Structures are given as structure tokens and as C-alpha cells.
Amino acid sequence: MSFWVEVSLNTPAQLSLPLYLPDDETFASFWPGDNASLLAALQNVLRQEHSGYIYLWAREGAGRSHLLHAACAELSQRGDAVGYVPLDKRTWFVPEVLDGMEHLSLVCIDNIECVAGDELWEMAIFDLYNRILESGKTRLLITGDRPPRQLNLGLPDLASRLDWGQIYKLQPLSDEDKLQALQLRARLRGFELPEDVGRFLLKRLDREMRTLFMTLDQLDHASITAQRKLTIPFVKEILKL
């Protein structure tokens, strides 16, 4: 399942950036672990009526995109215009798609490390940042795989801008937190993940959360199809472990 976010901008080129975002990646489905202060800061920025900026960094798969999707979901459900720009998919669009985004309530730029060294993209992001500062109304959330000063950007002024606001590292989940996150995801999908099965998954699989969630979805589907509860023998059978 997913919700549709479309950003139609009043620019000379009338650029449109339509995207499907997963509707199961919300704040309610995010297990914070040691990231309670980060979660509170994000929600505070979304509640305020004026502009705010947060830079969030973590390794791939830690949940940074989940948080941006959650922010988009929260504001779009309030009827606010939002924009989500996944720079790991930058071949889908051009830097000019950022033109006019300072008129939105929220702009989320994901995976900024993907355009480090790209002069056109760096300048487009720098210009958007400055326009957002001038407007004083748009919330800006940016994610990367490292702190701003370590991004190897070709435009020093952009690195300086990114370093201005609140900067948070998304802390990795402990194994206990990963178990809680899996059980939360299962409950939200309408089934229970027994503790022994969850610990078995953590022991036998790649512990990267994206992989674990995909496996959980696979097991949910298999359980429904076979009309069997999740047990370790059943999981071994389905995953061929």
C-alpha cells in the first residue's frame, strides 16, 4: 500500500514530481530506540507554523527515509503541500524540479550524498535553501549518509548552509530494539510475531532493518496463504533455513 504525493510547481516548465510513498512508514510505525530526541525534534518542526531545518544522517538502511516518508504523511494528511525528492533516483528528474518548492509546507531531500560533486544539483539545493530562508515558512528536512562537512561537496557555501541547523545522527537499533520494531510492524499489519520467532530471525538473517521488514512481509503472506501461525519450524520451511 502507498499514498500518492504529487508536487505541481508554478514554474515556467510546469514541472511535476509525482511519487508513491509507502503508507506503512509513519511515525506510529517507527521504533525510536535511542532516537527519542530526534523524533521529538522532527515532530516539533512539523508542528510549528514557521520554517525549520533538520539534517539527519545515518548509514543506508537505518531508517532515515522512513522518517522523511513519515513527515510527508503527517503533513499531507493535514492537507499541506509537501515535496519529497529522493536523490538516489535523480535520473527520474532534473535539478529544476526544486524551483518553486519554497512555497510548499514541507520539503524533504533524501540521500543528498548522491549528488555530492554534481555542480548543477548542488547549486539547485543551495538556491532552494536560500529561498526557504527568505520565505520563512517552509520546513526543510535533508538526509545524508554522513555529516554535512564530510559530504565532499564541491560547493563550500552549500556545506556551510547544511551545517547551520539542527544535525542529528540516527542511532542504530540494538538487537532488543530490532525485536521490538519487528513486533510493532507485525501488530500494525494485524498479526503477532512470537518473541522466539523474532529472536530466531535476528540470529539467522542479515540484521539490516529493511531486510528484516521485507522478510516479515514475506512471512506474513506465507502465513496467510498456508493458514498457519508463525513458528520457528514454519519460518525455517518458508525461508529454507
Swiss-Prot record:
What does the record list as GO biological process?
DNA replication initiation; negative regulation of DNA-templated DNA replication initiation
UniProt keyword terms in alphabetical order? DNA replication, DNA replication inhibitor
Tell me yes or no: is ATP-binding among this UniProt entry's keywords: no
UniProt keyword annotation of Chaperone present: no
Q: Which family does it belong to?
A: Belongs to the DnaA family. HdA subfamily.
Role according to the record: Mediates the interaction of DNA replication initiator protein DnaA with DNA polymerase subunit beta sliding clamp (dnaN). Stimulates hydrolysis of ATP-DnaA to ADP-DnaA, rendering DnaA inactive for reinitiation, a process called regulatory inhibition of DnaA or RIDA.
Q: How does it assemble?
A: The active form seems to be an ADP-bound monomer. Forms the RIDA complex (regulatory inactivation of DnaA) of ATP-DnaA, ADP-Hda and the DNA-loaded beta sliding clamp (dnaN).
Q: What is this protein called?
A: DnaA regulatory inactivator Hda
Name the source organism: Salmonella paratyphi A (strain AKU_12601)
- Provide the gene name from the record: hda
